[in-house]
């Protein structure tokens, strides 16, 4: 785009958002500005632009602008547009998952649970945690120290003897009254102290209890409390960092770059406990400055996730507008800090070291994947190999048939392009017909709309499935995609697969062939994606059919029963009185349900 001085002069000196648009109308880049005229004009005055920006400017046809009241409002609009439009030259962080929490339920004997979503009012949630592993690790540690139950309420209410967790000293067995309500409530209260970061107060409390027991010559209790103190010390050593006052809750965001790979590491500290780390890798981040990547992450990530009162960052960023926006989003004052001392400086160094390790691993993986892709391309004698699609079929004796399609593009699996297909209208258990139907579903619209076709199409199966795939592609007029079946062979052992071409030719690659490893990776991912979809569909169908086949039970009552008892097994375990206690279930209907399930 050449410089249009009249256009630049017409821009207001107000905050707002600008969009770089190409000749086809596609938005290439979205940015925000405190002063639109200055910011947009800077693109045409600077001579030291990054290669990424120079490439973008060559494609820009025109620039659209939107004026906002404040810079913070511009920042919010910018990031909403980036998430919605996904412009090619913006740094984009994808993070669609909600964060998990550790839950203490509001039951008379509260249980520890892993949870995502909005907790019920009577439950207490602690977190968020960066990943499910961190929650489960915390639950295991709390079980060791406080022996709180983790079983579902339906299981708890129907036990007649302690489970294995009691035998290995991970649960005090309140289900069969091996612990008093008062003692269990005290254990819950102490666990909550630990989760809230009051570990010092908890240690002092248990120490006082131990000393009191020893003075009363209750040496058994004193020894038990001594062991609890030791386990608590282990937990503190493993999860706690040195914190004081309001600094006990913070996120630490650090960025690093290795071999062209940028990684952002998010470290979560809640109640003085280091809950864990999570790494993020931006799309379109090539050539971006570290501060630019970090600012993009903070702005995009916290639009959809809980915001702590303090965020420590490893790079200096333009934090004024960002701080205002985050404070408005959180409904409280949020502080962004870069230049810090003492323990907070140590936290940033720790997060930065983790970011560097993540970038190093991703860089090594990328090099390895590039080698695999090149080896497979050369072996199959393909001019280009950028996109691979793989299909798999999953069912149980013909029930709940699901076809999966996974995509490998560039040097990684492209999960946004994954698809599952419900296969109906075929003979149950007919894998050949299922494969034919799946391919027709996948490529019918692609052909009509002139969409993207893969360079290589993998079919998890032998000659029969390959023949069906050939037939389906022929029906659609597709003849420029290399088709390859991946047959497991008689022994079905990994590493002994045979590759089958569309014309029936067979190819066996060495077990250590890099290209063969790539095929296995994509095939295994297709299998995983198919089987998880199949299990979900099968489980849903079985629950629906089991309850809805009972006279008087429709979708609404089925939902009430499942929510009340925590699942179908809980409904099965419930007696007539328990069933009749559910809203909308009369005693007569409860007896019908009980008899139908037994």
From Swiss-Prot:
All copies of domain GIY-YIG, residue ranges: 13-91
Keywords annotated in UniProt: Cytoplasm, DNA damage, DNA excision, DNA repair, Excision nuclease, SOS response
Domain UVR: 200-235
UniProt record, GO biological process: nucleotide-excision repair; SOS response
Subcellular location: Cytoplasm
UniProt GO molecular function: DNA binding; excinuclease ABC activity
A GO term from the CC aspect: excinuclease repair complex
Keyword Metal-binding annotated: no
Pfam family membership, one: UvrC_RNaseH_dom
Cited PANTHER family: UVRABC SYSTEM PROTEIN C, UVRC/OXIDOREDUCTASE
Family to which the UniProt record says this protein belongs: Belongs to the UvrC family.
Cited function: The UvrABC repair system catalyzes the recognition and processing of DNA lesions. UvrC both incises the 5' and 3' sides of the lesion. The N-terminal half is responsible for the 3' incision and the C-terminal half is responsible for the 5' incision.
HAMAP family named among the record's database cross-references: UvrC (MF_00203)
Known partners and oligomeric status: Interacts with UvrB in an incision complex.
The name this protein goes by in its record: UvrABC system protein C
Species whose genome carries this gene: Thiobacillus denitrificans (strain ATCC 25259 / T1)
